[in-house]
A protein has these predicted regions:
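Conserved thiamine diphosphate
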Residues: 2-50
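ATP/pyrophosphate-binding catalytic subdomain of soluble kinases
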Residues: 37-65, 74, 78
Length: 258
């Protein structure tokens, strides 16, 4: 898995091998990572036992000998950032297509990005908490050449009007982003927080990965568009029925008073 912003595959031309294998429908497919061993082992066990063909797309990052201990860190960060989402597809799970595709092994599968709380303390001793989304841009910070893709913003230029957390920025319609800039929180060796701006290429990679993750979510039912639409329709119908009953009771009550 590569997040090189200069790679054409980063901009919507990536071959999603796991999803391509799912398109065959009559095969067991697992997209797994060495960082999530329980999911990986379960996938191997199921795939080996099934009579169907099996396909395993496993993330095992290549690291140098001196950084071998970072293999699990990089693999885990790739999963967390939705750069390499986990899933399994098993035709034997049921006749309904939705029952065959599972994404529950992913961190916070119902969310766009995993959200974590970071406790911070200001220079005057005030304590607070930051809600941080983990995106592909956060994953890319682990790269040796990360400095090529970010710009550190001096604190005196921090503006709440023009600087938005990347996750919030990506939710905006493109027409509303002309006067906004996305940023990430990072921390230096002195444990001082910084805001850094990802370049446009990396920002668009995040947008593409969010779109790919939404596709996987929809397949897995963790954030299904049609399910949400049906729930909203049922809620609206229930509210309408409640309003109707209240109106009938008010009319009845008024008639009794008269």
């Amino acid at each position: 898995s590569s997040l090189n912003p200069e790679d054409d595959q980063a901009f919507g031309f990536r071959q999603e091998l796991g999803l391509l294998a799912v398109s065959h429908r009559k095969a067991f497919v697992s997209q797994a990572s060495v960082s999530h061993l329980e999911h990986l082992i379960q996938s191997f066990s199921t795939g080996i036992k099934t009579a169907l063909p099996s396909f395993f797309n496993v993330l095992a990052p290549k690291t140098t000998a001196e950084h071998a201990d970072q293999t699990f860190l990089v693999a885990g960060a790739a999963v967390e950032s939705r750069e390499f989402p986990l899933f399994s597809y098993d035709p034997n799970r049921g006749l309904e297509w939705g029952s065959r595709f599972l994404v529950s092994a992913n961190p916070q599968p119902e969310q766009e990005w995993p959200i974590y709380e970071l406790d911070v303390c200001s220079e005057d001793g005030t304590e607070s908490s930051l809600s941080l989304a983990f995106t592909p841009a956060d994953f890319m910070v682990l790269s040796a050449d990360a400095k090529n893709y970010y710009l550190d913003v001096p604190a005196q230029f921090w503006s709440e009007d023009s600087l938005l957390p990347l996750a919030e920025y990506l939710r905006l319609p493109l027409k509303d982003t002309h006067d906004k800039l996305p940023f990430l929180w990072t921390i230096d060796e002195q444990r001082v927080l910084h805001r850094i701006l990802p370049n446009i290429m990396l920002t668009e990679i995040c947008r593409e990965r969010l779109d790919a993750w939404s596709f996987v979510q929809d397949f897995g039912g963790s954030n299904n568009y049609h399910a949400k639409l049906a729930a909203e329709q049922a809620r609206a119908e229930a509210e309408l029925e409640t309003e109707k009953k209240i109106a009938e009771l008010e009319v009845k009550h008024q008639a009794e008073l008269e």
